[in-house]
């Protein structure tokens, strides 16, 4: 029950039942809205086949919100079809926010609370998420606008669509894989960082989570400005949260480093490609540049294990650190060391 409470973002065991009800209801509502929004576009794509359209609408709606990242026929996002792609993008984006954020937004909307009264977790998650999405969108347009492998003879619309997909999907959703091997090495590295960060805490996304990344940045800002407290939105972040963020980030960074080097040794691939596939596996991004294949089963097993650790690792580390500990019987004197 304590692990469930931690995963759902509540601190009271008595709230688990109520929060679970809201979580299930929210999932059904978002998936239902996505189903309705997808039907017209898929109906046109399937040339009026109602039965197949109903099946695909249901499948895409459930899969998008849960960030599963695969399709029944390998068709991806029906590339350049905005009527199908936008609902999937929106649903996948909601799935990466996390249950505490969705719950806080729903309660704030019901009680008509202004944004300034949102919880600190909601503010950090939304702010960091939107910054990452905008940065990814801008990066892709600037770096890949003249990429002839991707946009040979295409106009502005395909470029904008691919930029939107690159801004939302790599963090945990996957889907259309066909264009990824054609991007530049700089974009691969950038997307590797995005996939390593992942989505919101207690969400369907992977990675170290955006709040962890935000706390690390806030800690750096406090260190550079000589402040003892780590503050955000006129609130002080607890020291335990900072320790958890540092521990999760360090452990996951070590994992990505070791796995990337192992892939380089096994498959003789470049550092860029090894890093990309490793971060994609760890962050549950669903993308690949073809580092592992049937000819190298060891690499496939390593990536599969990385996916498993990426799904459970950050949560396990956070829970192990945040659980109550007995006070130490002895507290040693402080002594300065040289760092940096």
Locate predicted features.
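Membrane-proximal intracellular helices of multi-pass ion channels
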Residues: 1-340
């Amino acid at each position: 029950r304590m692990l469930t409470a931690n995963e759902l973002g509540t601190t009271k065991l008595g709230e688990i039942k109520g929060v679970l009800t809201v979580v299930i209801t929210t999932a059904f509502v978002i998936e239902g809205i996505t189903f309705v929004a997808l039907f017209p576009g898929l109906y046109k794509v399937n040339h009026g086949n109602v039965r197949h359209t109903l099946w695909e609408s249901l499948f895409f709606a459930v899969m998008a919100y849960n960030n599963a990242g695969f399709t029944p026929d390998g068709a991806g996002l029906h590339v350049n079809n905005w009527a199908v792609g936008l609902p999937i993008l929106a649903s996948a984006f909601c799935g990466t926010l996390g249950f505490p954020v969705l719950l806080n937004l729903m309660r704030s909307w019901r009680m008509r609370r202004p944004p300034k009264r949102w919880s600190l977790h909601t503010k950090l998650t939304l702010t960091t998420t939107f910054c990452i999405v905008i940065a990814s969108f801008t990066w892709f347009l600037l770096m890949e606008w003249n990429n002839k492998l991707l946009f040979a003879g295409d106009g502005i619309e395909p470029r904008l669509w691919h930029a939107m997909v690159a801004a939302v999907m790599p963090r945990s959703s996957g889907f259309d894989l066909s264009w990824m091997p054609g991007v530049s090495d700089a974009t691969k590295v950038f997307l590797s960082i995005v996939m390593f960060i992942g989505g919101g805490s207690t969400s369907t996304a992977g990675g170290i989570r955006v709040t962890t990344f935000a706390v690390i940045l806030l800690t750096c800002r406090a260190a550079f400005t000589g402040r003892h407290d780590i503050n955000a939105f006129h609130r002080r972040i607890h020291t335990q949260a900072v320790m958890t963020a540092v521990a999760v980030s360090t452990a996951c960074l070590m994992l990505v480093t070791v796995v990337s080097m192992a892939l380089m040794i096994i498959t003789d691939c470049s550092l860029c490609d090894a890093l990309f596939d490793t971060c994609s596996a760890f962050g549950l991004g669903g993308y690949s540049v073809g580092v592992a294949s049937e000819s190298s089963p060891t690499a496939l097993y390593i990536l599969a294990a990385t996916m498993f650790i990426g799904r459970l690792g950050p949560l396990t580390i956070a829970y192990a650190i945040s659980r109550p500990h007995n006070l130490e019987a002895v507290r040693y004197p402080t002594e300065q060391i040289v760092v940096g």
